[in-house]
């Protein structure tokens, strides 16, 4: 557990608290092992999310799906997978308001898509930004979760998955992550400044 608490987190990453680190499931002793376990877990979640059965039967614009997808992505690593955070962060909303904000975001996204308020890609970018930056519902894994659920919704509406910086690793420090964070922060500053994030997501 100490390797997690002592880890130097990349810019924009949510540091894992001791209470959350204690919820680690496997016997992992390095960040490298943790990343490998999470990557495998996420791959399995992806297979579930994009399977024809799930794409046909599940509705990603339901609050239950938001939690279920996060659980599927991290349930073999963290006991808090699929559970909303209970602590305040320097990003996202008050933890007591997460369910309310998630429900409102899902309703907004459904309205945007049904009424063609914006082009589908822009709907998805706005949804992604609100989920990861304005709500940030989970203790960790918010970016990876928000990107996958955004892809699922896009595919459900006839669009291709986003490339998110040509498939670059957005978890670790690097030019792609810096560009991704800069695009999110541009939207933080101006809710109509979607160009940078949209271009990054489709690059």
Task: Please tell me what each predicted stretch does.
Residues 1-203:
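FIC/Doc superfamily catalytic core
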């Amino acid at each position: 557990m100490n390797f997690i608490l002592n880890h130097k987190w990349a810019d924009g990453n949510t540091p894992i608290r001791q209470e959350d680190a204690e919820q680690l499931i496997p016997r992992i002793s390095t960040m490298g092992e943790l990343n490998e376990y999470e990557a495998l877990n996420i791959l399995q979640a992806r297979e579930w999310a994009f399977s024809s059965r799930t794409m046909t039967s599940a509705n990603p614009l339901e609050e239950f799906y938001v939690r279920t997808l996060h659980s599927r992505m991290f349930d073999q690593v963290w006991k808090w997978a699929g559970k909303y955070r209970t602590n305040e962060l320097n990003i996202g909303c008050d933890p007591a308001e997460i369910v309310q904000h998630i429900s409102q975001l899902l309703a907004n996204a459904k309205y945007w898509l049904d009424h063609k308020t914006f082009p589908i890609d822009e709907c998805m970018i706005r949804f992604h930004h609100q989920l990861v930056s304005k709500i940030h519902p989970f203790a960790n894994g918010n970016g990876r979760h928000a990107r996958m659920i955004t892809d699922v919704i896009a595919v459900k509406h006839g669009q291709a998955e986003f490339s998110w910086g040509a498939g670059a690793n957005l978890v670790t420090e690097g030019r792609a992550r810096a560009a991704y964070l800069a695009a999110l922060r541009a939207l933080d500053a101006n809710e109509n400044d979607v160009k940078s994030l949209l271009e990054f997501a489709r690059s």
